[in-house]
Every structure is written in C-alpha cells, then in structure tokens.
Amino acid sequence: LSANRLRESASPYLLQHADNPVHWRLWGREALEEARARDVPVLLSIGYAACHWCHVMAHESFEDEAVAAVMNRDFVCVKVDREERPDVDHHYMGALHAMGSQGGWPLTMFLSPEGAPFFGGTYWPPAPRYGQPSFRQVLASVTNVWLTKREAALGNGAAITAHLSSLADARAPGALTSADLDAAGFALLRLIDTFNGGIGRAPKFPNAPIFRFLGSEYGRRRDPRFRDAVRGLLDALCAGGIYDHVGGGFARYSVDAEWHVPHFEKMLYDNAQILELLAFAHAETPRPIYAARARDTFGWLMREMKAGEAFAASLDADQEGEEGKFYVWMAPEIDDALGAEAAAFKAAYDVRPEGNWEGRNVLRLKAPADPTLDASLSGARAKLAALRDRRARPGLDDKVLTDWNGLTIAALVRGAGVFEAPEMLRAAQAAFDALDRGQRDAGGWLVHATRGGRIGAAGLLDDSAGFARAALALFEATGAPNYLETAEAEARAARVRFGAADGGLYLTADDAQDGPAVRPRVFHDNATPSGIGVMAEVFVKLHHLTDAPEWREAAERLIGAFAGADPSELANAPSLLAAHDNLARGGCLVVEGAALRAAALAHADSTIVVFPLDRTLWPNGLPGGRPAPATTPSAMLCRGQTCSLPVYDVDALLSLVRA
C-alpha cells in the first residue's frame, strides 16, 4: 500500500504527480477504507493541469521527501483532478466556503475516514509567509487536532455535511416573473466596471454566463446599458493582454483590473463561451474586430486544442517551470524579428525596453482594438508566431470533457452562422460525431471524461445538457432530423438519470459510484453555465421546436424547482433566468430557402430557435402538427400553435424576429 497509485489514472493532471514521493491514492471507497483501517484522516488535494499555484505547491511540498514522509505517515493522501471529478470538487469547495474561506485551487481539505470535511484551505507555502502558516505547520496542527480533539473535528465535519445537504434539499416550488429578471439584471449591472469592462476588481474573469444573460436582457428590455456592458467586456478582452495577440485564444483571467496581464492558462470552456459572446454581439451590431478575434480563436482551437476530432481541455500556464514564459517578449527579440516593422509594433502593443510585466512584455493594445491597425500588423504577428513556435510549448491537457466540448460545438455553430464561416460548422459536426462515438460507456450512457479512448469519469448532468444543447445547435444549422432526435433522446434520459421528484435535476446520476456524500443540485453558474441552466434551455428549445407538452412541462417544473430561491441566489443563476426568459417570449422560426436560412442563423435574438425546413426530410409535416408554409422560400415565426403570416425576403424576416 506504500506506492503512489496515480499511474493507474488517465488524467494528465494526476499523472503529473505520479512520481511524487507522496503515496497518493485515487478518489474512491478504497482510500476511505484505508483511512478507516489506519485510523488517520484523509488529506484531499484537488487541482487541475493548467493551474499555476497547483504546480507551485507540488514543487514546494509534494516533491519534498521530508514533507511527503509526514503526509504518508499521518494521512491517507488523495489526489483529484477537478476537471475529471467536478462533483467531488463542488462538494468540497462548498465545504471550504462553509468554513468561511474564499476558495480556489489547489484545494486542500482534511476529511474523516467517512469523507466528512473538518478543515481546509487552498495553497500553503513551504515556510510561514504573508501571515500564512507553512504547510508542515498545517499538517502538524491537523494531526494534533485528530489525536486530541477528534470529537470536535468530527462534529465540525458532520455540521458542514449537514449544511451541504440542506443546500441540496428541494425548495418550495414557485414561478419566476419578469420582476425576477429585472432584479437580477440590475443587480448584475451594478457590478459592472464601466471604465475597464467586466465585473469587479482584480483578479478579473470573463464571467461569460453573466454576460450572455445581460445580452438577453438587452434583447428583452432594449436598455442600452445591458448592451454596453457586453460590449465593454468584449472590447477589453479583444485589446487586453488576456488575449493572445500572436496565437489567438483567451487566457483564463487577468491579474489586474485593466485586463493587462493574464494568468496564462487557456481553458477550452472560456474560449468557447467568449467566441459565442463575440458572435452574439457581432450579430447585434457588427464590429470587424469581433469577427477577427473569433476567427483567430477558432484557428487556435484547430491548431493547438484538437484531441482527435474533439477538443482538449486546457493549455498550461507554465513552461519550464516559469509562468507565461511561452507568451512574453523582450524588446530586443521583437527588434531582431521585425526589423523596420518593430517600432510601429512596439508602439501599438505597449512593448517597453524595461518590460511591462516583471521585466518582460505581455502584448496588449494601448488603444481600443482597431481593425485597420490589427490587419496592418498581421504580418508582424505571423513572424513572431513563427519565432515563438521554436520555444518549449505549454503542456496540453488532452483529455476530452463532454460538457466543455458541448459548449464549444454550440459556439462554433453560432460563429459559423454569424461570421459566415462554414469551416466552423464542419469542425462542430466532426466534434459532435466524436463525442457521440467516443464519450459513451458500455451501456451507451454519456461519460464525462476520456483520454486516449480510456474513460476517466462517469457522466454528469452537465455532460447530458451540453451534448443535447450542441445537438440542437447543429439541428438549427443543418435541419438534419437526427440531431433533433438525439437531443430529445438525451433530454429524456437525463430526466430519468438525474431527475428529482420536484422536477429539479441532480448533478450526479442515480447510479453514480464513488460520489460525494451529498448528491448536489447545482443551479448557480460559475465559469461555465450550470447543467440545470443548460438543460432548462434544452427543454425550452425542444418545446419551441416540437410544441410537445412534455417539454414545456419539463421546462416549467425545472425552472419552478429553483424559482423560490433568494433573489441573491437567482442573480448567481443567469443561465436559468435566461431559460425562463426564452420560455416566456421565445419562439420557433421556420425557414425554407438558403438566403432566409442564412439570415435566420445570423440573427441576434437568443430566444428564437431556428427550424430549417427541408420538405423531403419532413414528408408528414412539422412536429406538433404545425403547417408548413405554402410557398417557398419563406419563413414564419411560431409560438405554440400560433404562427405568423409567412414572409418571403430577408428584410421582412429580420423585421419579424425584431418585432
């Protein structure tokens, strides 16, 4: 039992720790039983492959023989990849929040052999620093508590577990109203940094689910403050150092309020959602810089993030032990590479002889992104890209996550329509086919994570929701009935596997193995939309497309299960709120004809779902008994069984969806 067991995993993050002197175990009953047999606590460490501070703590503590000896003697040590097991991460991050800590990664928790958390934190340094104890001091303190104050520790763990269980309990059912949307929208609007863009102070995250909701609120209210909040974020992202101006793609967050310096890891989910936001904003008011950033980010996805036909999870922040080394520049490097072009490039991108960040330069535009300037410097950027390609590359976490790929597929479909980019649609179709073939277990259920064809974790609600949403996006773009059929089948399966008696949904399936003690119901969004919010959108879109009563009922019950939450909680669930708005005022736009279909797919209203009609594929008429237009090409907007009169040209179609 003394060996490090992480080589048994497929996770790139866990494999990074496979040579640690720590006797790491994989998450599961076996580790808890070992702790029970040895009568010691569990030390649970949760991180992810692209996490800079996870690497720092690993180097400082987990690679240290003396620290590892203490860990091995006094604890059963368990490593978890948060991307592979978001259910475990959610449970124990919630426990840390309940203890009054802000949270973050690496997440370090101490558990009873039953898995109850009684103490925790995030990163601890190897020596006392900045008012923090050293990691060894923490280990000694926890061991002392376990030996001398165990009853108190177990009581604390039981109380925290009970609190987490109460959060997962069913709430009084209710119904959302436009007043709830108003309250949440204005609460979020008050958080906007109107000068720098985005929300709050440093560190700054894109918070894409919030801005997607603010965009839908602009569609509902036509209040320009909501539109300007979205534009303010996107303008800042397009110009700032958080965007990789040489290679494309956006970093996870900025360490400053101005978006100047990123934390350099690149996550698939961020780039998917930002690409989709760029498409929505460009559809509302075309801006060439949005199209340029979307196309370059797509190029980065195809060049650097492919895992077969699907997409990999993340790129690391560190190269050769140094954060951001791959991405930053010295001024003389740029002089040598660009020659006569160097002066204009350095002036545009704030390149200084002394550096603009820790002696080196993060490329960022000094002025708002200008498409003319951007295009004029494309040759210079290409030269730097060729030079940068000779450097040691950041590590790629090449596991395939179903939910994140679902976000990416839907974003690419949206981008294909708005930016007239059929290559995005082809990539989306290929990725979807890869998920449908490769992300299933022996029983045919979707799984959450695979790597090299090996299953890493069972499927969660977020996977079913993201996959179904991706299928619906592809149906809107192609009209192929198999996508609609797949979405319906996955939505029905999710209601069975994840369903609660009140119409709500659990994160984990009813047959989940080795899950946390509490089966969570997660309706608030984080960096990604909640599975509940996404599945609510799926139910609503299926209702609009098919007019089947089961989908309206499913949507109403799912939204209603959380409608009784406190207003502050609802403001943290923008995806669920957007689904309610879609149910209340959305509809199905039936279109036939290439020009009308293209216009429909490029429109800005997220509450309108497109039904591309090919009469040869629907010989028995439209779902729900709706009549097909008598004349082709034509379009009509249906809400339930009520449809508009047909329109026959693009201008009339746009007037119809904007009415």
Language-model region placement:
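Replace the tail clause
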Residues: L1-A411, G415-V418, G452, I559-A659
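Inter-helical turn/loop segments and adjacent helix faces that build the functional surface
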Residues: E217-R221, A281-I289, G415-P422, L474-P481, ...
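Glycine-rich, acidic and aromatic/proline-enriched surface loops and short helix-turn segments
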Residues: A236-Y243, A430-G438
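Long, polar/charge-rich, low-hydrophobicity segments
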Residues: R303-K306, R437-S464, L472-N620
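Glycine-rich phosphate/oxyanion-binding loops and their immediately adjacent helices
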Residues: L412, G417, A427-Q429, A471
